[in-house]
Design a protein with these regions (language model features):
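Intrinsic low-complexity/disordered segments
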Residues: 9-12, 20-23, 41, 48, ...
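Serine-esterase "nucleophile elbow" of acetyl-processing enzymes
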Residues: 51-101, 111-120
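Bacterial N-terminal signal peptides
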Residues: 31-47
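Intrinsically disordered, low-complexity and often Lys/Arg-enriched segments
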Residues: 2-33
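Acidic/histidine-rich helix-loop elements
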Residues: 71, 96-105, 133-137, 216
């Protein structure tokens, strides 16, 4: 075979290799795209939440003054202590504290959709309800709001931890039992994690005054590690 023909053959082979590689890459890309579409369709068909592949391990805390460092030095509340705990435990998680002093379950319910969309959390901690009781709001409203928030978080693909609260004895035994019970009722109905009493070891001890600020409503700096100690065992189960 003449040398000139060999050169042409090599050139033709080079063009063929480039063409076949390009077609193969296009085929693989199309296959990957079809696989993602199929997974999304299956998830929708079976009612499973579709979560972004880049979703980070984010813990969203939706609470009131108990989680917003009311009356405390910055960095001493239980939420900043949680961030330090995660770092010490080498847990790669980000904490977003969306707590607002004075907030009620109605306020939390009005904010939850935007918070879920913005932060795409893997875990949502709901610490609300105390201000509902202080304002004498209907228990049915509090329960409905907690249920709606829990369902929204679950629909977004997040795990949920409810932090239960109790009211002082002067509210009456029947009201106190019903109020404390609504947290477990919601948790059981929605199949989510529950911490029965967020302020255990803080508000139910003989020397209560030593654990609270002068207003006798908000835990002081000394109480914050105990509050974290209450939350951590339940939260740890959700982030492992």
């Amino acid at each position: 075979m003449p040398l000139s023909n060999l050169k042409i053959s090599f050139l033709e082979m080079s063009h063929f290799n480039k063409w076949s590689s390009s077609r193969l890459a296009q085929g693989l890309s199309a296959s990957a795209g079809m696989a993602l579409v199929l997974l999304a369709l299956l998830a929708l068909f079976f009612g499973l939440p579709v979560r972004a592949a880049t979703q980070s391990n984010t813990i969203l805390i939706v609470g009131d003054s108990l989680s917003a460092e009311y009356g405390l030095r910055r960095g001493t509340g239980w939420v900043p202590l949680l961030e330090k705990k995660l770092a010490a435990e080498k847990v790669p998680a980000k904490v977003v504290n969306a707590s607002i002093s004075g907030d009620t379950t109605s306020g939390g319910r009005s904010r939850i959709a935007a918070l879920l969309k913005t932060h795409q959390p893997s875990v949502v901690v709901i610490e609300l309800g105390g201000n509902d009781a202080l304002r004498g709001l209907p228990l049915g409203m509090t329960e409905a709001n907690l249920t709606a928030m829990t369902q929204a978080a679950k629909k977004a693909g997040a795990k949920v931890l409810l932090l239960g609260m109790m009211v002082p004895p002067n509210y009456g035994g029947a009201y106190g039992a019903d109020f404390a019970g609504l947290f477990s009722k919601v948790a059981k109905a929605e199949k989510v994690a529950l911490l029965p009493f967020f302020l255990a070891g803080v508000a139910d001890v003989p020397d209560v005054a030593a654990q609270f600020q002068a207003d006798r409503i908000h835990p002081n700096e000394k109480a914050q590690p105990k509050m974290l100690a209450n939350v951590w065992p339940e939260l740890k189960k959700l982030i492992q």
